[in-house]
């Protein structure tokens, strides 16, 4: 009788594991892949997020690691896609860039907070005069993007930054914006971005050819603070979340996700609860402020042929309507 009870108990544990893998979309291996082996646990919260149904691989590790990025790319098909959605033909570029970085780990608080509340802070003018700074700083993880400053805007957007996504044309070069507690995440859109990273890390003169505007000629962050975002995250944002076509008609320029949507996709992989701020744009008032900083207006957005902002706004509206995310700047 005792053996029968033990057998039922062990069977229950096995069934729980199988159901857990199905619900969370894990890779199904008995032992995790290399990209899952981080000093910090990406998913150690048993509370299923409201957005879980959006992701095929919720436990996907978001940063590239030199030791296993080729294996990870083969596992998830990233080796079949060109930039910005894969590593195809540019594996050596990624390997060279990763060889100069000291770490691919997540940050320390991931060990201490089991269910992480995150806020993704956009740069939209809707943040002006909202005084959300204290609210934003109360989250476990704060994700920002590009050169959206906190210096001088603390009352509106807070002081803390956990992750800041950037590309060479958008990263800070003024040391007054340096934050030792920020992890700076390079989003690679083109081969020149990886060349730039190599040149800037080894102190070589920066080749500015191939950029849509002059990239930063120096980096305010230390090597230990820099990560490279896995292109799978960008691919997921484009094809799975925004439903962009794999091939655009010849008479149309291909559209790619904005850094904001990419940052949101990153949050879905490392957070249990996601809130947004600064993602609402007023397309009907061209003279309204584009950002919470500077003097740019919404009229500039009409000239942008690289992104599909209408599709992104509809996607965000749907997420908010279904309560998959909470919008702090709804009104």
Swiss-Prot record:
Protein name: Type 2 lactosamine alpha-2,3-sialyltransferase
Subcellular location: Golgi apparatus membrane
Ranges in a coiled coil: none
Annotated organism of origin: Rattus norvegicus (Rat)
Recorded name of the encoding gene: St3gal6
Topology feature Cytoplasmic, residues: 1-4
GO CC aspect terms: Golgi membrane
Enzyme class: transferase
Catalytic activity: a neolactoside nLc4Cer(d18:1(4E)) + CMP-N-acetyl-beta-neuraminate = a neolactoside IV(3)-alpha-NeuAc-nLc4Cer(d18:1(4E)) + CMP + H(+); a beta-D-galactosyl-(1->4)-N-acetyl-beta-D-glucosaminyl derivative + CMP-N-acetyl-beta-neuraminate = an N-acetyl-alpha-neuraminyl-(2->3)-beta-D-galactosyl-(1->4)-N-acetyl-beta-D-glucosaminyl derivative + CMP + H(+); a neolactoside nLc6Cer(d18:1(4E)) + CMP-N-acetyl-beta-neuraminate = a neolactoside VI(3)-alpha-NeuNAc-nLc6Cer(d18:1(4E)) + CMP + H(+)
Annotated Gene3D superfamilies: Glycosyl transferase family 29
Its biological purpose: Transfers the sialyl residue from CMP-N-acetyl-beta-neuraminate to the terminal galactose residue on sugar chains of glycoproteins and glycolipids. It's alpha-2,3-sialyltransferase activity is specific toward type II glycan chains (Galbeta1-4GlcNAc) on glycoproteins and glycolipids such as neolactosides nLc4Cer and nLc6Cer, whose sialyl-products serve as precursors for the Lewis X antigen. Critically involved in the synthesis of functional selectin ligands needed for neutrophil recruitment during inflammation and lymphocyte homing to the lymph nodes.
Lumenal side: 26-331
Keyword Glycoprotein part of the UniProt annotation: yes
Keywords recorded for this protein, A-Z: Glycoprotein, Glycosyltransferase, Golgi apparatus, Membrane, Signal-anchor, Transferase, Transmembrane, Transmembrane helix
Molecular-function GO terms, alphabetical: N-acetyllactosaminide alpha-2,3-sialyltransferase activity; sialyltransferase activity
GO term, biological process aspect, one: protein glycosylation
């Amino acid at each position: 009788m005792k053996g029968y009870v033990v057998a039922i108990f062990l069977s229950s544990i096995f069934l729980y594991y199988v159901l857990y893998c199905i619900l969370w979309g894990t890779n199904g291996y008995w032992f995790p892949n290399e990209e899952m082996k981080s000093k910090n646990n990406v998913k150690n919260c048993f509370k299923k997020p409201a957005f879980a149904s959006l992701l095929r691989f919720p436990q996907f590790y978001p940063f590239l690691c030199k030791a296993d990025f080729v294996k990870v790319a083969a596992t998830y098909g990233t080796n079949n896609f060109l930039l910005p959605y894969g590593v195809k033909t540019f594996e050596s570029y990624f390997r060279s860039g990763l060889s100069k970085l000291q770490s691919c780990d997540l940050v320390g608080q991931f060990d201490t907070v089991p269910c992480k509340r995150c806020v993704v802070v956009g740069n939209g003018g809707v943040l002006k005069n909202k005084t959300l700074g204290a609210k934003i700083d109360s989250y476990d993880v704060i994700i920002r993007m590009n050169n959206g400053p906190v210096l001088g805007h603390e009352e509106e957007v807070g002081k803390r930054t956990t992750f800041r996504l950037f590309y060479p044309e958008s990263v800070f070069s003024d040391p007054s914006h340096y934050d030792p507690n920020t992890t700076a995440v390079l989003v690679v859109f083109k081969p020149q971005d990886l060349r730039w990273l190599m040149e800037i890390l080894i102190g070589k003169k920066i080749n500015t050819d191939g950029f849509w505007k002059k990239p930063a000629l120096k980096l305010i962050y230390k090597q230990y603070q820099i990560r490279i975002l896995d292109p799978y995250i960008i691919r997921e944002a484009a094809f799975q979340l925004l439903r962009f076509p794999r091939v655009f008609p010849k008479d149309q320029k291909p559209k790619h996700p904005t850094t904001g949507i990419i940052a949101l996709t990153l949050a879905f992989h490392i957070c249990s609860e996601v809130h947004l701020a600064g993602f609402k744009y007023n397309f009907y008032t061209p003279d309204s402020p584009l950002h919470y900083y500077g003097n740019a207006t919404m009229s500039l957005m009409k000239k942008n042929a690289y992104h599909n902002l209408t599709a992104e706004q509809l996607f965000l509206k749907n997420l908010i309507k279904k309560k998959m995310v909470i919008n702090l700047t709804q009104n």
